[in-house]
From Swiss-Prot:
One of its GO terms (cellular component) is cytoskeleton. Transmembrane segments: none annotated. NCBIfam families: chap_CCT_epsi, thermosome_alpha, thermosome_beta. This is T-complex protein 1 subunit epsilon. It comes from Schizosaccharomyces pombe (strain 972 / ATCC 24843) (Fission yeast). It is found in: Cytoplasm. It comes from the Eukaryota. Belongs to the TCP-1 chaperonin family.
Length: 546
C-alpha cells in the first residue's frame, strides 16, 4: 500500500495493534484564510516585479542564470520564465504569462499586473469578511461586462496589401517599449513585410513556421534586414568553391556522403597494402557514384544534413559541385519549402523534379572575422522569409528578436481580427467605468466584487503613469473625468508627454483579441487562486525518524 514506508505497527498495553505514521510533525500546513492570503502575497510580489516594465517608459531587468548568462529584457514572459520561482501559486503566474505569449504574443506584462491587482483587491474584500468564492463569482460577472464593453468600444482598422499604414502603426506601438524603440520604424516595416509575405489574407491565417528570425552579433540594430528567402548559418564546405551561384538547382539530402556501412556492429581486418588500396578504390568509386547521381539529376549545389570527410569534399570540388554540410533539420525543411524542393533520403531517389530552385545563393562574410552565412534568395516559393537581426552584443540581438516577435504577433492578430481598442490605459479606464456602472444595478455582495474588479482595472493606467514619471493619481483622475464628461473611449495616459491624451490621434492601439484574452486569463487565474484554501507540504524523506 502506498505511503506505508513511513508507518510502523506498535501495540498498546493491552496488546491491541495500531499504526503509528512517522514524520507527521515534519509536515507543514496552511489552512483557510491564511492559505488564501499566502497565495495572494506571492502573486502580488511577482506582479510588482514586472509592474515597472509596463508601457513605453517601462524599465528593463537584468536576469543572471545559474551559469552566469545575462539577459536584459522588459518582456514580461521572458522575465518570469527566467526567474527562479519556488512558490507554487507564483508558478501559476509564470504559466499565465506564457499562455498569453503563446496565444497572443503580446501583453504578457499587462496580464500579470492585472492578475496581481485583482488578487490584491480580493484580499481587502476577504478582510471585510466576504467569502472567496463569492468574490470569484463577482469577478466572473464583472469580466463578462468588461469583455462585452470592449466589443462595444472597439474600432476597425482597414488594411490591404497595398495600404499597410495601419498595420505599420500597430507594430510601431508594440515596439515603443523595447530596446529597439529608436529604430521602431525600421522594425515595424520589417514585421509588416514579413507577415504579409507569408499571410493568407483570404483565410485570415499567418503561418509563423515560414518566418525565421536569425541574428548575428555585429553592426547596429539599424542593419537588421528582411531576406525574401532563407539565411543559413553555414558556409561552403571548401574555401575554393564558388561564393555565388546563380540559377541554383539544389539537391537537398538527408543521406551522408560516405560509403554504406552495415547496421550491426562490425570490424574490418586489413592485413596487406593491396587490401587497403582496394578499400580506398571502393570508397572512391562509391563517392564518384554518389556525385554522378547528383550531377545526372542536374543539381549545381548540394545541401546535406550530414557531414562528409575531406576525400568526399575534394571530389566534390574536382567535379565542380559546391556543397554545404551539417545543415540542421529545421533549416533543411525551410530550404525545401522556400525552393519548392523535396528532401531526398537516398541518392538513388534523386531526380530533376526533386531539386529546389533559387535565383541566387551567395556566401556573405562579416567584418574582419571569418564568420560566414549562406543566403538563399529569389526562391521558387516567395512565401518563406528570414529576418536577419544585427546588434552590438548578444543581449541586444536577443532582445531585438523578442521585440520583433511581439511586433510580428500584433500584425498577425490584426490580420486574424482587425478590431482594435485604444492603448495607454484607455480601454481599461473605459471598462472600469462600465463595470462600476453595472455594479450599481446589482444588489448584494456581488456589487463589492464588481467594484473591486473596476478598481483593479485602474492599476494598468496607474502603472503606466507611474512608469512615465507622472503623478499617477492626478493623471488617472483627470483622464477618468474626461471619459465621464466627454464619453470618449480613446482617451488614455499621455506616457510620452506629447500634450494630448487622444490615443486615436497618437495611434496607440491594442488588438481586441489580445485585450480580451488578458481579462479572461487574469480572471480565470484569480478564481483558481481564491478556491485553494489548504496547503500541505510533506516532510522530507531524507530526515531520520527519532
Amino acid at each position: 500500500m502506498a505511503g506505508l514506508d513511513n508507518a510502523v505497527m506498535v501495540r498498546d498495553d493491552q496488546g491491541n495493534p495500531f499504526i503509528l505514521v512517522r514524520d507527521q510533525e515534519k509536515k507543514r500546513r496552511l489552512h483557510g484564510i491564511d492559505a488564501v492570503k499566502s497565495h495572494i502575497l506571492a502573486t502580488k510580489t511577482v506582479a510588482n516585479i514586472v509592474r515597472t516594465s509596463l508601457g513605453p517608459r517601462g524599465l528593463d531587468k537584468i536576469l543572471i542564470s545559474p551559469d552566469g548568462e545575462i539577459t536584459v529584457t522588459n518582456d514580461g514572459a521572458t522575465i518570469l520564465d527566467q526567474m527562479e520561482v519556488e512558490h507554487q501559486i507564483a508558478k501559476l503566474l509564470v504559466q499565465l504569462s506564457k499562455s498569453q505569449d503563446d496565444e497572443i504574443g503580446d501583453g504578457t506584462t499587462g496580464v500579470v499586473v492585472l492578475a496581481g491587482a485583482l488578487l490584491e483587491q480580493a484580499e481587502a474584500l476577504i478582510d471585510k469578511g466576504i467569502h472567496p468564492i463569492r468574490i470569484a463569482d463577482g469577478y466572473e460577472k464583472a469580466c463578462q461586462v468588461a469583455v462585452k464593453h470592449l466589443d462595444a468600444i472597439s474600432d476597425v482598422v482597414d488594411f490591404s496589401p497595398e495600404n499597410t499604414t495601419n498595420l505599420f502603426r500597430s507594430a510601431k506601438t508594440s515596439l515603443g517599449s523595447k530596446v529597439v524603440s529608436k529604430a521602431h520604424d525600421h522594425f515595424a516595416n520589417i514585421a509588416v513585410d514579413a507577415v504579409l509575405s507569408v499571410a493568407d489574407l483570404q483565410r485570415k491565417d499567418v503561418d509563423f513556421e515560414l518566418i525565421k528570425v536569425d541574428g548575428k552579433v555585429g553592426g547596429s540594430v539599424d542593419d537588421t534586414k528582411l531576406v525574401k528567402g532563407v539565411v543559413v548559418d553555414k558556409d561552403m564546405s571548401h574555401p575554393q568553391m564558388p561564393h555565388r551561384i546563380e540559377n541554383a538547382k539544389i539537391a537537398i539530402l538527408t543521406c551522408p556522403f560516405e560509403p554504406p556501412k552495415p547496421k550491426t556492429k562490425h570490424k574490418l581486418d586489413i592485413t596487406s597494402v593491396s587490401e587497403f588500396e582496394a578499400l580506398q578504390a571502393y570508397e572512391k568509386e562509391k563517392f564518384q557514384e554518389m556525385i554522378k547521381h547528383v550531377k545526372d539529376a542536374g543539381a549545381n549545389l548540394v545541401i546535406c544534413q550530414w557531414g562528409f570527410d575531406d576525400e568526399a569534399n575534394h571530389l566534390l570540388l574536382q567535379n565542380n559541385l559546391p556543397a554545404v554540410r551539417w545543415v540542421g533539420g529545421p533549416e533543411i525543411e525551410l530550404i525545401a519549402i522556400a525552393t519548392n524542393g523535396r528532401i531526398v533520403p537516398r541518392f538513388e531517389d534523386l531526380s530533376s523534379d526533386k531539386l529546389g530552385s533559387a535565383g541566387i545563393v551567395r556566401e556573405v562574410s562579416f567584418g574582419t572575422t571569418r564568420d560566414k552565412i549562406l543566403v538563399i534568395e529569389k526562391c521558387a516559393n516567395s512565401r518563406a522569409v528570414t529576418v536577419f537581426v544585427r546588434g552590438s552584443n548578444k543581449m541586444i540581438v536577443d532582445e531585438a528578436k523578442r521585440a520583433l516577435h511581439d511586433a510580428l504577433c500584433v500584425v498577425r492578430n490584426l490580420i486574424r481580427d482587425n478590431r482594435v481598442v485604444y492603448g495607454g490605459g484607455a480601454a481599461e479606464i473605459s471598462c472600469s467605468l462600465a463595470v462600476t456602472k453595472e455594479a450599481e444595478k446589482i444588489p448584494g455582495i456581488d456589487q463589492y466584487s464588481m467594484g473591486a474588479f473596476a478598481d483593479a482595472l485602474d492599476t494598468i493606467p496607474l502603472a503606466l503613469a507611474e512608469n512615465s514619471g507622472l503623478s499617477s493619481i492626478e493623471a488617472l483622475t483627470a483622464v477618468k473625468a474626461r471619459h465621464v464628461k466627454e464619453n470618449k473611449a480613446y482617451l488614455g495616459i499621455d506616457c510620452l508627454q506629447t500634450g494630448s491624451n487622444d490615443m486615436r490621434k497618437q495611434f496607440v492601439i491594442d488588438p481586441l483579441i489580445g485585450k480580451k484574452q488578458q481579462l479572461l486569463l487574469a480572471t480565470q487565474l484569480c478564481r483558481m487562486v481564491l478556491k485553494v484554501n489548504d496547503i500541505i507540504v510533506a516532510g522530507s524523506k531524507d530526515d531520520d525518524y527519532n
